[in-house]
């Protein structure tokens, strides 16, 4: 169980990245996909991670220390159109550097919004993740916002758009859909040396 999740620090640039020998489980996804809500749900706390009504609120890499054992790491959202070109470039460089130069990443949760067809940026991120030797899981957020039939249809659209062979796990922060499953996965990932 993820009973003890604490915010540790934020990195706004490469120099600010946390140096640690602890495992890191990473969240990636476009702006406003629900990464902060995902963390708050796992922590069972409403305001641990700041949830923004405006997309692109998280512009830093945020580290959360879990059970005094490993880090849950929230990467900045990508693809937000109101970011300046320079902000997009900085965000992209920070994400790339963090993943490329980090041997402590044990798993990546790739979050997509179940209500919408994946964007070109989602497809690029998926292809990029495939090129890495890091295991990842696709999480389809906001699953409570659509009915069961539409949920299956949209998962199929996500799979076809990304050409994904992996399982896609529907998730809802509001209705706690598959929270137990994801906690179980995190525990398995963390126990696997």
Go through the PLM ranges and name each one.
Residues 66-105:
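Conserved nucleotide-sensing/catalytic segment adjacent to the nucleotide-binding pocket
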Residues 2-14, 145-193:
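Canonical P-loop GTPase G-domain recognition
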Residues 88-92, 119, 179:
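Amphipathic alpha-helical transducer elements in NTP-driven molecular machines
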Residues 25, 32-33, 39, 62, ...:
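Structured catalytic cores of enzymes that bind and process phosphorylated ligands/cofactors
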Residues 21-22, 40-43, 85-88, 123-127, ...:
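Short, glycine/charged-enriched secondary-structure capping and boundary segments
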Residues 57, 70, 77-80, 115-117, ...:
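Conserved nucleotide-binding/hydrolysis micro-motifs of P-loop NTPases
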Residues 93-167:
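Conserved C-terminal guanine-recognition region of P-loop GTPase G domains, centered on the G4
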Residues 1-82:
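Conserved G1/Walker A P-loop phosphate-binding module
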């Amino acid at each position: 169980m993820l009973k003890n999740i604490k915010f540790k620090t934020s990195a706004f640039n490469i120099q600010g990245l946390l140096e640690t020998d602890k495992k890191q489980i990473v969240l990636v996804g476009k702006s406003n996909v629900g990464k902060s809500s995902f963390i708050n749900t796992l922590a069972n706390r409403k305001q641990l991670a700041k949830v923004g009504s405006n997309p692109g609120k998280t512009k830093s890499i945020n580290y959360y220390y879990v059970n005094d054992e490993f880090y849950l790491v929230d990467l900045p959202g990508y693809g937000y159109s109101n970011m300046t070109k320079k902000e997009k470039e900085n965000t992209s460089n920070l994400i790339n550097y963090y993943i490329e130069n980090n041997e402590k990443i044990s798993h990546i949760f790739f979050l997509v919004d179940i209500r919408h067809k994946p964007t070109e940026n989602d497809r690029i991120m998926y292809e990029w993740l495939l090129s890495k030797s890091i295991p990842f899981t696709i999480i389809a957020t906001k699953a409570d916002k659509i009915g069961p039939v539409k949920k299956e249809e949209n998962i199929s659209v996500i799979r076809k758009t990304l050409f994904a062979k992996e399982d896609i796990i529907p998730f809802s922060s509001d209705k706690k859909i598959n929270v137990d499953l994801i906690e179980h996965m995190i525990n398995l990932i963390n126990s696997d040396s």
